UniProtKB/Swiss-Prot annotation:
Gene designation per UniProt: coaE
Species for this entry: Chlorobium luteolum (strain DSM 273 / BCRC 81028 / 2530)
Protein name: Dephospho-CoA kinase
EC code(s) of this entry: 2.7.1.24
Biological process annotations from GO: coenzyme A biosynthetic process
CDD domains noted in UniProt: DPCK (cd02022)
Amino acid sequence: MTPSHPFLVGVTGGIGSGKSTLCRFLEKMGCELFEADKVARQLQVSDPEIMEGIKSLFGKDVYSKTRSGKLSLDRKRIAREVFSHPATLGALNNLIHPKVYNAFRQRALEAFGRGTAILVMEAAILFETGRAADLDFVVVVAADTETRIKRAVTRGLGTPEDIRKRIALQWPQEMLVARADYVVNNDIGKTKLKEEAGRLYSVLVEAAASGPDCQSKRR
């Protein structure tokens, strides 16, 4: 059967795992990259339905205007609330992620038209939304918990306690690993991760050439 889209790859992992760095390497090697979290952030200040939903969850004053007139969203406030109330986090994800996935499917069509062979979606949550089953291949980036906490703190994502709370709300890493088609262990430095990315890229090229009928644990 002739494919109607590029080979679709998901890259996921918990906070501080290094999935973004891995994806940057894959992009430089020739993959096209779709950043789900970046698209979600854009939709939060541009999509009327999502904006109304966010106002319902967090109050109208969660949005404000900057001096230049640009719409601003109080993301720190949202983060405090969702990571203290798991039900609110679930409601926010249900509001945003279907539209993020629609944007990904549209990108896949456009990428196919450009002749893109491999389209990578970087996403903080993938199995959790049920979208992993729609992909041809899923990569999980894993790392030791303390290493992940240090990385997240260094990036300014919160205090160690904040990061621990966020990790506690995410799927356990072992659950992600058990469902992956490929696991990158990232308790290593950037140079080693680049080498791992090179090996992964070779696997993806071979899998893309063989088609989507891989031995996936999700099927």
